[in-house]
């Protein structure tokens, strides 16, 4: 036995080594370096990570809504081993585990952190395990894992081994409770550090812990340390075997320093001088053997070589980009700057010690490249703070002026010319509306800068508005129009025409927030220039202005006035009255301070506060709640009897929230009751710091996540909101305006879905009581605020988790214990399990005693048995019993704690009689019989082996003798017999005649290629074809099924049915050669032609996938016209009429199974071979067959019978698909709801803008009784007048095969006609699961306005439909 155990251990070690080495990505291969990645909105965007081995920057995966777990299947990025900054995961739905996505991510450097953290997992609602089992080093920063309600395996990871430097600052809270997690680590994951503990990422992956001698760096699978220059592991002992390098990597080798003639780049790799970025927009510096973006402190760019840095002599020149100084914070951006590359514009209205602050921040500026403008700086008295200014180059000027001073009410002095010498290279001076600035002060500057005084005009320097205190008279300026939106106001006013047009310098638009009306233009100002008014200058040639960046639902005061020359005639100025306007409403921010508590086992009470920014009149709130499903199968794997169970505390009641229950902080007063002890100052300070830090982190997260998109003109999203998507999370809300404001207790809405997301609307209240909930269950709660204006939408969700209280009697064992069997020294007992326990039963306690014994019943230690073991053995067996009477009782234990003990049950164990009975024939076995049985069994075994070898040989090499199977179009390959075989025939094509050109996409059995076939078509030496393949890993049965489904088309010869060109069945891989349909399938064709202006459709994942298809390059982007739709409908009906004439029932007619040729002719094709590509269009029955329920007729859904008339129903759905450009039928309904809806007589609604005549044809196809539906020939007859003339030449309807057929009238068809072939897909009693339909676009018709509503088609309705 020990030998066997030892061999098993060696095999396991070897397997671990192979797997480890197979997953390892050695760095000595070619690196594929990617920049920072921000992946959001769609799962498909993850493919940007393909081939990346190192991300030099951060990786953010966030805000992916409406995704399911299966959407991530097939996605894996094993090449990625290193991230140099941080890794952020935030609100990604459907993602449960990272082990498959990033199996080899080993290092997160943390060069730049996300708010002090290198790894952040925040509000990942579906995440169950982190699973980064290769992660070995976080070299800088900490870990923050918070608010992940399903995340387990956190206590089985020792982060001190991974993030040693930031371990003390790790923040891991508000995830799934430990006692609710399985957290099962295999025995090989047990280490001693310093105490014995199990460390693993999941049940199949241990945490890698290296010996102390290796300094956290060891090899995978075998013992041994990595080279000292490695981090993240290695696959060998040298510096070339590292997964990642601790210092620098160069040519696949990890080094402490870069070699000569190379430069350190981004602190991780060595590059040559040529590789250091050197472009027009980015000139990196070569300094001290580093390639860096800017010169370090104390150095400046070399004048002769911009690639080098030279040490400064004295004050180091510092170049800065120009900009506006409108506050002290803005001035601080120029601290230390000596050269301004651009303009220096100062417009500062006030502040404490403003001159000192400006001198400290702007006092070193020596040169300005463009111009200096001092505009409306009411707090300035002098410009002496620009004490070092020596040169204004005037490369770009403000309307021709290099020094521009306008409207500075308190400016009295310019510069101290005894210490200042300013040169202006180009441009003039401009001084206007500086009432305290004397003219001689201005002329002094004119002289100092070297401008001739005679070159100065009144247009440049006003003789009347500088140094004067004169009041100007104003004419009335009329505001003609005010338009508002949620964040801007558009003003239009009457044109002002002074006697001399040159007198008008500009208009000034002023605005400010105000709650009241009746203010004047001087309100909000003081003598120091502090003002609440904001102003904009507008060109004198314009009489309109757009004020942007405003707050929604806010009242603003508006004023327009003119600036004219002071020397102009009386009445040359004008201003308007102050008018008021309110911006439009917008969606509010999410509700604040959501608190959920439970006061009973079936109730949750939710309270919240209004949004910080209601942005309108918040009238109601939508509260959504859904019970969190528990993975019972996984949770039962934990051995609760060994580890013990800490009862889970449900969500607190209101009293618990208000009062602190911790006993050490309580004291007793005179009446014996407890009161809360006051907290110490240190405790209060720590709580305040933690709360402030938490708020600061979440603000940082939201401000960095919800950033404004590039090229986006609308206002950026408000922070702390969920993103707005094309399909709002609250799109199915129901607003009941008659609901009383006092009705706050709302029971959950009944629904067939066993665990739906429910919602209720709360009007004019900030609390709701949810009743009828399941006891001791965790619910995810979302509270959404909505304004009265439904058009602006609702807020993002405020999300909380809460658990109802336990039901005290739910864990009690119902009924009595049954003694199933008593045998020798054992008794098998069975008892019924609790019907509806608190969460789930984890184990049972069993107490038994022999009656008459002297030990006390209550003092006996109970036995413990896990629930899953009890279920597996159908009871519990007590062994090692001696004869006598016994008494036993049981109790169940759930996550809520122990249930009540059951009643006593007694049983009797008889004394065993061990003496043999010579008269018992069962105890007498003849030796001859035993020998005969052994020989017979050996012979049977030999015969079975011989038969197995013969059968496998026949299956593998006996293809020539295998008969053909039955051929028919199968939606469900699982239902085909495994005996179906394929025999090569005249359709066989030599493999060498087929040439593959490029991939077109993935098919049901394998890849589909575009190719060329030689000498396959008569008189055509080379033709383009589509080649379907079967995967090399496919089984023999799958290859035969692949060939048999292709064989269906061998008997077809119709222009509107895809033609089979040949089959290559000999050798591997198996090929099926088809007619090339250059524009792909009709579903993607329609989606590629959706108009771009349909925002929510053209941006959908399905539309993007269709537009990125290989077929798109053969296509144009114009949507099909109504005439095109009718033409497509006609040719599809013609192809189906041919199949009906051949007694062939398609059973899966849909746009996905129709193909489009280069000339846009549509043909019936594929016959069941596309179901894997569009798996979301199918519905799996009982884990087996895939059914296209959204295209199936009522009789097919009810009894599983398919005829050509059921194909006509599917044809009507195809017409609906074409009218909506391939929207999904029955959107918003689950597959089970669709099944019931159709069986009950429901049909698809008319798409918006769809012509009545086309919808009438759809309804004809959707007649409930199949005998009332038209045949495909009748449909062609109806449509033929609208079809192109070429149709008559190629159609089956006009062919000799159909010649002489009398048009089939509807009344000629028997009600229960069995003329067509009937096939039964599934038994009538089949059960259907309630899998919801996948998210899809809102149905629409692209034909709005393109034709009269009544259409131009003369639709002839068959006689029988008139009844």
From Swiss-Prot:
<keyword id="KW-0677">Repeat</keyword>
<keyword id="KW-0812">Transmembrane</keyword>
<feature type="glycosylation site" description="N-linked (GlcNAc...) asparagine">
    <location>
        <position position="137"/>
    </location>
</feature>
<keyword id="KW-0418">Kinase</keyword>
<keyword id="KW-0597">Phosphoprotein</keyword>
<dbReference type="GO" id="GO:0043560">
    <property type="term" value="F:insulin receptor substrate binding"/>
</dbReference>
<dbReference type="GO" id="GO:0051897">
    <property type="term" value="P:positive regulation of phosphatidylinositol 3-kinase/protein kinase B signal transduction"/>
</dbReference>
<feature type="glycosylation site" description="N-linked (GlcNAc...) asparagine">
    <location>
        <position position="278"/>
    </location>
</feature>
<feature type="glycosylation site" description="N-linked (GlcNAc...) asparagine">
    <location>
        <position position="816"/>
    </location>
</feature>
<feature type="domain" description="Fibronectin type-III 4">
    <location>
        <begin position="813"/>
        <end position="912"/>
    </location>
</feature>
<feature type="glycosylation site" description="N-linked (GlcNAc...) asparagine">
    <location>
        <position position="617"/>
    </location>
</feature>
<dbReference type="InterPro" id="IPR000494">
    <property type="entry name" value="Rcpt_L-dom"/>
</dbReference>
<keyword id="KW-0479">Metal-binding</keyword>
<dbReference type="GO" id="GO:0043548">
    <property type="term" value="F:phosphatidylinositol 3-kinase binding"/>
</dbReference>
<feature type="glycosylation site" description="N-linked (GlcNAc...) asparagine">
    <location>
        <position position="732"/>
    </location>
</feature>
<feature type="glycosylation site" description="N-linked (GlcNAc...) asparagine">
    <location>
        <position position="743"/>
    </location>
</feature>
<keyword id="KW-0165">Cleavage on pair of basic residues</keyword>
<feature type="glycosylation site" description="N-linked (GlcNAc...) asparagine">
    <location>
        <position position="665"/>
    </location>
</feature>
<dbReference type="GO" id="GO:0042593">
    <property type="term" value="P:glucose homeostasis"/>
</dbReference>
<dbReference type="InterPro" id="IPR009030">
    <property type="entry name" value="Growth_fac_rcpt_cys_sf"/>
</dbReference>
<dbReference type="InterPro" id="IPR020635">
    <property type="entry name" value="Tyr_kinase_cat_dom"/>
</dbReference>
<feature type="compositionally biased region" description="Polar residues">
    <location>
        <begin position="1343"/>
        <end position="1353"/>
    </location>
</feature>
<feature type="transmembrane region" description="Helical">
    <location>
        <begin position="929"/>
        <end position="949"/>
    </location>
</feature>
<dbReference type="InterPro" id="IPR006212">
    <property type="entry name" value="Furin_repeat"/>
</dbReference>
<dbReference type="GO" id="GO:0005009">
    <property type="term" value="F:insulin receptor activity"/>
</dbReference>
<dbReference type="Pfam" id="PF00757">
    <property type="entry name" value="Furin-like"/>
</dbReference>
<keyword id="KW-0464">Manganese</keyword>
<keyword id="KW-0325">Glycoprotein</keyword>
<feature type="topological domain" description="Extracellular">
    <location>
        <begin position="721"/>
        <end position="928"/>
    </location>
</feature>
<keyword id="KW-0829">Tyrosine-protein kinase</keyword>
<feature type="active site" description="Proton acceptor">
    <location>
        <position position="1148"/>
    </location>
</feature>
<dbReference type="InterPro" id="IPR036116">
    <property type="entry name" value="FN3_sf"/>
</dbReference>
<dbReference type="InterPro" id="IPR011009">
    <property type="entry name" value="Kinase-like_dom_sf"/>
</dbReference>
<feature type="compositionally biased region" description="Low complexity">
    <location>
        <begin position="1322"/>
        <end position="1331"/>
    </location>
</feature>
<keyword id="KW-0732">Signal</keyword>
<comment type="subunit">
    <text>Probable tetramer of 2 alpha and 2 beta chains linked by disulfide bonds. The alpha chains contribute to the formation of the ligand-binding domain, while the beta chains carry the kinase domain.</text>
</comment>
<dbReference type="GO" id="GO:0043410">
    <property type="term" value="P:positive regulation of MAPK cascade"/>
</dbReference>
<keyword id="KW-1133">Transmembrane helix</keyword>
<feature type="binding site">
    <location>
        <position position="1028"/>
    </location>
    <ligand>
        <name>ATP</name>
    </ligand>
</feature>
<keyword id="KW-0675">Receptor</keyword>
<keyword id="KW-1015">Disulfide bond</keyword>
<feature type="domain" description="Fibronectin type-III 1">
    <location>
        <begin position="473"/>
        <end position="586"/>
    </location>
</feature>
């Amino acid at each position: 036995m020990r030998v066997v155990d030892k061999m098993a251990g060696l095999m396991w070690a070897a397997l671990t080594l192979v797997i480890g080495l197979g997953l390892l990505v050695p760095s000595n291969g070619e690196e594929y370096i990617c920049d920072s990645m921000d992946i959001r909105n769609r799962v498909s965007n993850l493919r940007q990570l393909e081939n990346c081995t190192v991300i030099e920057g951060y990786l953010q995966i966030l805000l992916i809504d409406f995704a399911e777990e299966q959407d991530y299947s097939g996605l894996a990025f094993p090449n990625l081993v290193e991230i140099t900054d941080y890794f952020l995961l935030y609100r990604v739905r459907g993602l449960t585990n990272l082990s498959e996505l990033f199996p080899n991510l080993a290092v997160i450097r943390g060069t730049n952190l996300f708010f002090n953290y290198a790894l952040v997992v925040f509000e990942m609602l579906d995440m169950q395990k982190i699973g980064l089992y290769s992660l070995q080093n976080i070299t800088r920063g900490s870990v923050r894992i918070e608010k992940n309600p399903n995340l387990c395996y956190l206590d089985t990871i020792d982060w001190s081994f991974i993030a040693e430097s930031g371990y003390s600052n790790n923040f891991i809270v508000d995830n799934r409770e430990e006692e609710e997690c399985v957290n099962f680590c295999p025995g090989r994951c047990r280490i001693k550090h310093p105490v014995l503990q199990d460390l693993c990422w999941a049940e199949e992956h241990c945490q890698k812990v290296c010996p102390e001698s290796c300094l956290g760096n060891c090899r995978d699978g075998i013992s041994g340390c990595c080279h000292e220059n490695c981090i993240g592991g290695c696959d060998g002992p040298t510096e070339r075997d590292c997964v990642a390098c601790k210092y620098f990597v160069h040519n696949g080798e990890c080094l402490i320093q870069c070699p000569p003639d190379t430069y350190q780049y981004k602190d991780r790799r060595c590059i040559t001088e040529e590789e250091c970025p050197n472009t027009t927009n980015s000139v990196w510096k070569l300094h001290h053997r580093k390639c860096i973006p800017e010169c370090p402190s104390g150095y400046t760019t070399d004048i002769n070589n911009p690639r080098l840095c030279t040490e400064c002599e004295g004050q180091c020149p510092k170049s800065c980009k120009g900009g506006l100084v409108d506050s002290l914070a803005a001035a601080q951006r120029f601290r230390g700057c000596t050269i301004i590359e651009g303009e220096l514009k100062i417009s500062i209205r006030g502040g404490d010690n403003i001159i000192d602050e400006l001198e400290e921040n702007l006092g070193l500026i020596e040169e300005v490249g463009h111009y200096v403008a001092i505009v409306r700086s009411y707090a300035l008295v002098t410009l002496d703070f620009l004490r070092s200014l020596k040169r204004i180059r005037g490369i770009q000027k403000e309307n021709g002026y290099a020094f521009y001073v306008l409207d500075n009410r308190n400016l009295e002095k310019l510069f101290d010319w005894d210490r200042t010498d300013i040169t202006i290279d180009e441009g003039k001076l401009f001084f206007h509306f500086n009432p305290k600035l004397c003219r001689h002060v201005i002329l002094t500057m004119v002289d100092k800068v070297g401008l001739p005084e005679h070159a100065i005009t009144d247009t440049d320097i006003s003789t009347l508005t500088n140094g004067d205190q004169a009041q100007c008279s104003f004419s009335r300026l009329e505001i003609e129009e005010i338009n508002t939106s949620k964040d801007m106001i558009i003003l239009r006013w009457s044109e002002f025409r002074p006697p001399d047009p040159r007198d008008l310098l500009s208009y000034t638009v002023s605005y400010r927030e105000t709650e009241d009306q009746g203010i004047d233009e001087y309100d909000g100002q003081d003598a120091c220039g502090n003002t609440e008014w904001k102003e904009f200058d507008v060109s004198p040639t314009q009489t309109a202005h757009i004020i942007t960046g405003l707050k929604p639902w806010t009242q603003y005061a508006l004023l327009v006035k003119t600036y004219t020359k002071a020397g102009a005639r009386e009445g040359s100025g004008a201003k308007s009255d102050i008018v008021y306007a309110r911006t439009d409403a917008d969606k509010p921010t999410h509700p604040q301070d959501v608190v959920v508590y439970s006061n009973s086992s079936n109730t949750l009470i939710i309270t919240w506060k209004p949004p910080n920014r209601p942005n309108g009149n918040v009238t109601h709130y939508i509260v959504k709640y859904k019970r969190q499903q528990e993975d019972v199968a996984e949770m039962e794997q934990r051995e609760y009897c060994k580890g013990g169970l800490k009862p889970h505390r449900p969500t607190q009641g209101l009293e618990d929230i208000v009062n602190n229950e911790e006993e050490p902080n309580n004291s007793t007063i005179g009446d014996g009751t407890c009161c809360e002890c006051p907290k110490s100052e240190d405790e209060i300070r720590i709580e305040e710091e933690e709360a402030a830090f938490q708020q600061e982190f979440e603000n940082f997260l939201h401000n960095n996540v919800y950033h404004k998109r590039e090229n986006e003109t609308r206002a950026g999203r408000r922070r702390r909101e969920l993103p707005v998507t094309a399909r709002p999370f609250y799109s199915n809300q129901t607003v009941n305006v008659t609901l009383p404001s006092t009705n706050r207790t709302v029971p959950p809405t009944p629904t067939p879905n066993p665990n739906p997301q429910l919602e209720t609307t709360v009007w004019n209240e900030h609390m709701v009581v949810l009743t009828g909930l399941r006891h001791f269950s965790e619910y995810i709660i979302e509270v959404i605020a909505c304004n009265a204006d439904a058009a602006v939408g609702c807020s993002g969700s405020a999300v909380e988790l809460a658990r109802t209280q336990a039901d005290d009697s739910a864990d009690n064992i119902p009924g009595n214990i049954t003694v199933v069997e008593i045998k020798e020294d054992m008794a098998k007992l069975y008892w019924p399990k609790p019907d509806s326990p608190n969460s789930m039963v984890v184990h049972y306690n069993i107490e038994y005693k022999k009656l008459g014994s002297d030990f006390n019943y209550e003092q006996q230690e109970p036995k413990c048995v896990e629930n899953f073991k009890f279920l597996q053995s159908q009871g519990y067996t007590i062994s090692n019993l001696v004869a006598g009477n016994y008494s036993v009782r049981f109790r169940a234990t759930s996550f809520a704690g122990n249930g009540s003990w059951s009643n006593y049950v007694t049983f009797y164990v008889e004394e065993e009689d061990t003496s043999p009975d010579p008269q018992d024939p069962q105890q007498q076995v003849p030796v001859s019989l035993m020998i005969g049985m052994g020989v017979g069994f050996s012979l049977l075994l030999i015969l079975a082996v011989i038969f197995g070898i013969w059968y496998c040989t026949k299956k593998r090499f006996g293809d020539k003798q295998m008969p053909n199977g039955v051929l028919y179009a199968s939606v469900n390959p699982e239902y085909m017999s495994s005996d179906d075989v394929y025999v090569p025939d005249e359709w066989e094509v030599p493999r060498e005649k087929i040439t593959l050109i490029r991939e077109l996409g993935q098919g049901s059995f394998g890849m589909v290629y575009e190719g060329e076939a030689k000498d396959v078509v008569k008189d055509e030496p080379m033709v383009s074809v589509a080649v379907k393949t079967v995967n090399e890993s496919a089984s023999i049965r799958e290859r035969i099924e692949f060939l048999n489904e292709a064989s269906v088309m061998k008997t077809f010869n119709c222009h509107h049915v895809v033609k089979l060109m040949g089959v290559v069945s000999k050798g591997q891989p198996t090929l099926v050669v088809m007619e090339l349909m250059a524009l792909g399938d009709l579903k993607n064709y329609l989606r590629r032609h959706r108009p771009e202006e349909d925002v929510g459709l053209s941006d959908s994942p399905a539309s993007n996938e269709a537009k990125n298809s290989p077929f798109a390059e053969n296509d144009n982007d114009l949507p099909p016209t109504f005439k095109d739709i009718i033409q497509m409908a006609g040719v599809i009906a013609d192809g189906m009429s041919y199949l009906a004439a051949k007694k062939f029932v398609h059973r899966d007619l849909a746009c996905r199974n129709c193909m489009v040729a280069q000339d846009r002719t549509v043909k019936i094709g594929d016959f069941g071979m596309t179901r894997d590509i569009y798996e979301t269009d199918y519905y799996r029955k009982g884990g087996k067959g895939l059914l296209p329920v959204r295209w199936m007729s009522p009789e097919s859904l009810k009894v599983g019978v398919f005829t050509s008339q059921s194909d006509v129903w599917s044809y009507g759905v195809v017409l609906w698909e074409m009218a909506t450009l391939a929207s999904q039928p029955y959107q918003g309904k689950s597959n089970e709801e669709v099944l019931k809806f159709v069986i009950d007589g429901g049909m698809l609604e008319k798409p918006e803008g769809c012509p009545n005549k086309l919808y009438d044809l759809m309804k004809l196809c959707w007649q409930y009784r199949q005998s009332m539906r038209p045949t495909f020939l009748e449909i062609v007859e109806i449509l033929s007048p609208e079809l192109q003339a070429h149709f008559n030449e190629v159609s089956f309807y006009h062919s000799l095969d159909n010649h002489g057929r009398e048009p089939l009238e509807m009344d000629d068809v028997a009600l229960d006609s069995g003329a067509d072939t009937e096939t039964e897909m599934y038994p009538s009693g089949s059960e259907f699961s309630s899998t919801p339909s996948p998210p899809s676009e809102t149905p629409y018709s692209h034909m709005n306005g393109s034709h009269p509503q009544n259409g131009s088609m003369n639709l002839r309705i068959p006689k029988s439909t008139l009844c």
